[in-house]
Amino acid sequence: MENWSITVPCFGGELDLEEVMNAKPDSETQKVQTKTEPKKTEQKQESAKKSEGPKLAEDQCAYFNEHIELKVAVIKSVECNPQGDKLYIETMDDGSGTDRIIQSGLRPYLSEKDLIGQHVIIASNLAPRKMKGVESRGMLLAADYTENGKEKVELLTAPWAPAGTPVVLEGADESFQKPAKIDIEKFCKVEMRIKDFTAQIAGKKLTAASKPITTTKSNDCEIC
């Protein structure tokens, strides 16, 4: 699952040094602050716009049915990416006859044994992306939850469905042809959530082989 965030600590030593080197009388400092305030306000507004991300589609179910391809894949093997301390390299059978490699930031949460053999749900038409020297073709879907004060991750799985089974909204046409590739911005135009321990989009259930995708521990949270 490649969209899992990796937190980087921020060190504030530069601020202390700047205060020592550029100390000014109160009146002068106030003038400088007055001159720079408009620029800071503009920067904050620009930053806020960037953090908003892509807007959700007006009709999320229709958009999902037309653009986003999910399918079941079986994890055959797992290895650690030596260049990324949180990344697994997962080799999967996606039903196409050719192995698919997906990277996900699950090492802090799940062991290799937890992953091998799982019938996971993947975003299969996301454009390939190189991460830490290895091309990742798609994204593994999961949800998070808290247990005993500790953040944990639960895979979205469909153990009853063979590799390659389409994952669609209830009642949707499984044979509908979707784009071969979409970018992450298009993928993020739909919000997938766990509600009542069931994967849903705008109140409609996600299914594999006509059976709903459910969780056992994650609930009332976003799928990522």
Name each model feature, range by range:
Residues 1-224:
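Phosphate-backbone binding interfaces of nucleic-acid-interacting proteins
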